[in-house]
């Protein structure tokens, strides 16, 4: 796991958490805007960083490393954390664990889907072959590319922005293994996020 810091370190700290199978670089286009208000720390999960050879094991394992980083560098407290999709689950989990403090948790487009272990294994096993080939090569399946080509320019720009988060159209991500993809999907499904999380001093924003 790596943490990519940028901006003015005297400003409040915000941690940014990518979505499922997404790269830390998916936040690159908004960093300049955020630097007006925050010192940014973009989280790059184990198994999904091009600059190290690791494998994603579980959300709990990743949370422990994130908590250690926040305790070591930021005194155990940060101003904000934003996560989309899987990243939103990480923000929720970090808040409910209460091992560090986040003033504002911002959750975007997180379905908070959960499943039992058997169903999670089946779902993850079904997803891996499709996702692995697409992410590994950086090329959409032909039927998806044809559908994309038929959309209008506004939608196409939106879809391409979404696909770029997975490295699609950027040469692919050959360092990401099938096991990392499986473990990330499986762990997200079986890791329970509490309902009605209420931590004094923390405000949770959901959109």
Predicted regions and their residues:
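Conserved HGGG/HGGXW glycine-rich cap/lid loop of the alpha/beta-hydrolase fold
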Residues: 4-52
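Structural beta-sheet core signal
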Residues: 16, 81, 107, 205-206
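Active-site signature of alpha/beta-hydrolase-fold catalytic machinery across serine-
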Residues: 29, 93-97
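Active-site loop/oxyanion-hole signature of alpha/beta-hydrolase fold enzymes
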Residues: 41-82
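Gly/Ala-rich beta-loop-alpha elbow adjacent to hydrolase catalytic centers
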Residues: 82-91
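Flexible "cap/lid" loop of the alpha/beta hydrolase fold
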Residues: 96, 102-136
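Helix-loop "lid/cap" segments that line or gate small-molecule binding pockets
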Residues: 139-164, 183-189
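Conserved serine/cysteine hydrolase catalytic core
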Residues: 176-207
């Amino acid at each position: 796991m790596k943490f990519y810091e940028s901006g003015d370190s005297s400003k409040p700290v915000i941690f940014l958490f990518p979505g499922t199978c997404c790269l830390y670089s998916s936040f690159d286009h908004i960093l300049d805007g955020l630097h007006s208000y925050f010192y940014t720390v973009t989280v790059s999960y184990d198994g999904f960083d091009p600059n190290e050879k690791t494998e994603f094991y579980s959300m709990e394992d990743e949370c422990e490393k994130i908590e250690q980083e926040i305790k070591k560098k930021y005194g155990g407290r940060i101003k904000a954390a934003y996560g989309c999709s899987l990243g939103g689950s990480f923000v929720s989990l970090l808040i409910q664990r209460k091992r560090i403090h986040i003033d504002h948790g911002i959750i975007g487009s997180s379905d908070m889907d959960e499943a039992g272990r058997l169903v999670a294994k089946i779902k993850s096993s079904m997803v891996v072959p499709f996702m692995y080939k697409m992410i590994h090569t950086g090329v959409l399946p032909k039927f998806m590319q044809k559908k994309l080509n038929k959309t209008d320019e506004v939608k196409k720009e939106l879809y391409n922005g979404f696909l770029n988060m997975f490295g699609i159209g950027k040469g692919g991500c050959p360092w990401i293994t099938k096991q990392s993809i499986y473990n990330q999907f499986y762990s997200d499904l079986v890791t329970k996020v509490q309902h009605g999380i209420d931590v004094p001093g923390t405000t949770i924003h959901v959109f």
